Structure formats: structure tokens, C-alpha cells
Amino acid sequence: MVTLYDVARIAGVSTATVSRVVHGQDKVRDSTRTRVLEVIDQLGYVPDGAAQSLSRRRKNIIGLVCVERQSPRQQYDIESMSLLFYDEILRGVESRIRHHKWSLLITYLEEAGDPDLPRLLSLSGQVDGLLIGEGIVPSEYLARLAKRLPVVVIAGSPAERAADVVTADNRAGSAALLRHLIEDHGSRRLFHVDGPITAPDARERRLALNELLAANPHCQLVGSSQGLFSVASGEEAGEKLLAIWDEARPDAVVCANDQMAIGVLQAFAKAGVAVPEQVAVVGFDDIFPGSLYDPPLTTVHQPMRLLGERACTRLLDRIARPALRPKVELLPTELVLRSSCGCPPGTVTRRPVPPLRAGRSEPSAAPRRRRTPPVSPS
């Protein structure tokens, strides 16, 4: 088994320096830190003897690495995806580990900048396996971790090959929502509030939008705004749209998650824009606050608690059978129709979303025109 002494010897540094690098301490030169990390990667070193523990002294602990996103308007955005999304994930994970009488160790990594590899290496030495949230660790780092211990990515990219992935069928869910706007409400002009560039969920939802626009030439994207999956960034997107309202004038605002959709609704309410009479607003995720807003939010339900359950089950299977080949599990979504899209007040309709045929969004029939045209905000 590779030891801390082996790393120190090959890197040409003291064992104390290796320890400081592994634990993310600051008193190490950048060049030295880089050299030590390269040797750690080359040797496949796992701190704290975790590699031996996997085969001989199982700890019965798994780790969960969550994504922490901070809004530019608030140092601590209490409405961020980190809380509302991961609360349900945690409930699902906890239900499985409690059944197996295991324990859970939780940490948060900030999305900005490179992943904190020393911190992840240190965490890997304390657990039997890792659950990693939604794209916070790039594939090259993920491959390194997966060589050291079992790893499952929650809400990761369906194209991921370095580790197991459990995620919702985001493309199918987004395609169903967009078809509803076009076919049932006559939406032609769409404004998109996108999620973080690094978030696989946002990438899949964006792909569904691009495919739909390509298949439906009568529709057009009149503008877009990059958000952070937070209410504050959604409100900023709404303000951006209001500033170009006369030129953009969309039929519908398509948001990559519910928090941002709520932020857009807040911006519109302040400006006197009536939803859905002047413009439709839709989200994704089906978080509880969306159902309480006025108007209640049309969205796509992704089974967040089930994501946690299935990811935990897969990780425990991989810990027991390390030779399992990585696989991607897509969980089905549900279209949740309320009144923010233009459905009658009081509507609460749920429609299961089938997988996309041939992996692509299907073209729609020519949409009916919206009966009430959008007007400038007061």
C-alpha cells in the first residue's frame, strides 16, 4: 500500500509538507503543492489508509459532497440550490444509510474556481465511498478519485464515464414543458434564464431548448440571462428582461430551475407585469415554495429524494462489489401544470414524461397564438 512516506520520498519533501498539502493548509509554496499533488495522483495515494480500510476495516461511513453557490447580491443566499435541492437529496440518502446502519459525512464545496482536491483527498480517507453533487468535480478529477474509492455522482452528466451517475431525465422533462408552452399556449418568443455553466442539469435543459428551437422555426429565442440557480440571480434576469422589454417582449420566460423562476416573478411583480396574462413563467425541479407563489409555478418535477436513495443504493453496491462497471441511471420526470404558464387558475395537473425517442426533442405543430398579447410593463 502506498504511504505518506512514499509520496514524500518521490516528491523530495518532508512528510509534514505532504500532510499540509493533503489537508489543504496554506503554508506550502504553489510549486511544491503542485509537485506533491502530481505524485499523489501518480501513486494513487489515499490519506489515512482508506484503501486498506476498503478491503479490511470498513468504516461504514459514506461522504456527500454538495455544491455551494453564492449569489452576488448576498454573501449567504439562503434560497440557493444548495439548501432546497440538497435537503431532499439528504433525506433520500439518509433513508438508505439508516436502513443499512451506516453513517453520513457531509461537506460543501464552493462552485467558483478549481475543485478543492486536497480537501477531497482528505475526505476520501475518512469514508468508504463518496456521493458527489452535480458537476462540482470535473471528469479528470473524478477519474482520480474513482481510482481511490467508490464514487457516485448525483445529478451528473449522462455523458460521464469516469464514475456512476444517477440523474433525472432533464432533456425529456424540459422538452415536455417547452412543447406545452408552444402547443397549448401558443408561445413563440422565449426568453431563457439559464443555470450555471458547470451544472450538468442546466446543460441538459439548455440542450432541450436548443433542439426545440432548431425543430420549430416558428419559435425564436429573444434573449437569455445566465443565473446561479438562486432567487437573487432570477430577479436579476427579470430586471435585465424588463430593461429590454419593448424590443424582446417574450411570450414565455423559461427558467432552468424554480428558484430563478420565483426571482423572475418577484421582478415582474415589482414592475407591474401580470403573469400569465402578459407573459408566462415556468421553472424546473418542483420545489415546495413554487406551489405557494402567486401565481403557482408551472414546472417539471424531478424526484430529488429518489435521486438520493438511488445514488446511495448504487454506492453501497459499488462498495460491496468494486468491479461493477460504471453506469448512468436516468430517473423519469413529471410535468406539473399550474397557472403561471397560462393554465386556468387552480390548475394542478401532473403528467408523467416519457423518455425522448431517438434522444431528441420532437418538432411541434404550429402553435396557437396567445389570446392576450404582451404589453409594456407599467
What positions do the PLM features span?
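Short gly/ser/thr-rich secondary-structure transition/capping motifs
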Residues: 42-48, 111-115, 133-135, 235-236, ...
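Periplasmic-binding protein-like
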Residues: 127-133, 189-193, 223-225, 245-257, ...
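N-terminal helix-turn-helix DNA-binding module of bacterial transcription factors
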Residues: 1-61, 342-348, 355-378
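Hinge/beta->alpha junction and helix N-cap segments in small-molecule ligand-binding domains
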Residues: 71, 79-88, 106-114, 166-176, ...
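Alpha-helical recognition/docking segments in bacterial nutrient-uptake
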Residues: 61-179, 247
